[in-house]
Amino acid sequence: MRCLALDIGGTKIASAIVTDGKIEQRQQIATPQADAANAMHDTLANILALYAGQFDYVAVASTGIINHGVLTALNPKNLGGLAEFPLKESIARHTDKPIGLLNDVQAAACAEYKDEDKNAVQNFVFITVSTGVGGGIILERRLLTEPNGVAGHIGHTLADPNGPVCGCGRVGCVEAVAAGRAIEAVSSQWNPPCTPKQAFELFRKNDEKATALIQRSASAIANLIADLVIGLDVQKVVVGGSVGLAEGYLPLVKQYLNMMPHFYHCTVEQARHGQDAGLLGAAWWVADCLKQGVHLK
């Protein structure tokens, strides 16, 4: 079956036909900013017209939370004019094919999981450590999405009850301690100020301040992994994102995890898929849902 896959981000929208895990006719345009809702309706109409007659179903990976086909977020301000955008309804105006939607990190989790030995790995988590911290959770070989689309927002679990206030409003979330934005909040106050990239360069040179800062982030992610293992019996975790893939970061996470009792351990690996993870993962997930007879809300 041929899939029209879309990956809707804050700055770009990618689209392609995905057939048997192969991407064809990939296009990329800027995400509308001015008059965002009306412009997004027009953009989606144009994309559907471009690929008309070439697909059997539509799969969408999007930033934010997909709640019953509507785009929202823990902090709706992050979506600007697209908060509460009726994403599924907008697409359905232009096609009668099945439509499946999930958030971009859930889609990336599917991209990382799709080639796993499903008999060996039934419980799997993808964690992205980037500007923020997010995740996708697969339990008993099925992506956890229901009922309100928030499953996988593991960056908003607790890391430090006395830590910084997170953008979601809670104190001490993992994201507020471990994410690139959290690293920058500290390193930007140094003399001279540093970006997260520069902080990592100093970390690799054994700078004391930078090492403590990166260790704080890696320790929070290691504890998050341990919580997932003990709470959900997770067998494998894959880590991606600009921070998660930074040189020296994942070995540090593993080091902290290995210091814990063995029943908190699991396999931890680096993400393999890059910019097209959203397209590939969304296409795989919707195809699997259709194969299993799962209703796409």
UniProtKB/Swiss-Prot annotation:
In Swiss-Prot or TrEMBL terms, this protein is called N-acetylmannosamine kinase
What is the uppermost EC class here?
A: transferase
The highest taxon in the source lineage is Bacteria
Query: Quick one: which residues bind ATP?
Result: 5-12, 132-139
State what this protein does. Answer: Catalyzes the phosphorylation of N-acetylmannosamine (ManNAc) to ManNAc-6-P.
What NCBIfam families does the record point to?
A: PRK05082.1 (NF003461)
Q: In which pathway does it act?
A: Amino-sugar metabolism; N-acetylneuraminate degradation; D-fructose 6-phosphate from N-acetylneuraminate: step 2/5
Give the Gene3D superfamilies listed for this entry: 3.30.420.40
A Gene Ontology annotation in the biological process aspect, one of them, is: N-acetylneuraminate catabolic process
Organism of derivation? Pasteurella multocida (strain Pm70)
What does the subunit comment say?
A: Homodimer.
Question: EC number(s) of the enzyme?
Answer: 2.7.1.60
One Pfam family in the UniProt entry: ROK
Its taxonomic path starts at: Bacteria, Pseudomonadati, Pseudomonadota, Gammaproteobacteria, Pasteurellales
Recite the UniProt keywords alphabetically. Answer: ATP-binding, Carbohydrate metabolism, Kinase, Metal-binding, Nucleotide-binding, Transferase, Zinc
Q: Which GO terms describe its molecular function?
A: ATP binding; N-acylmannosamine kinase activity; zinc ion binding
What's the catalysed reaction?
Answer: an N-acyl-D-mannosamine + ATP = an N-acyl-D-mannosamine 6-phosphate + ADP + H(+)
Any coiled-coil ranges, and where?
none
Report the family membership: Belongs to the ROK (NagC/XylR) family. NanK subfamily.
**Where is Zn(2+) bound in this sequence?**
156, 166, 168, 173
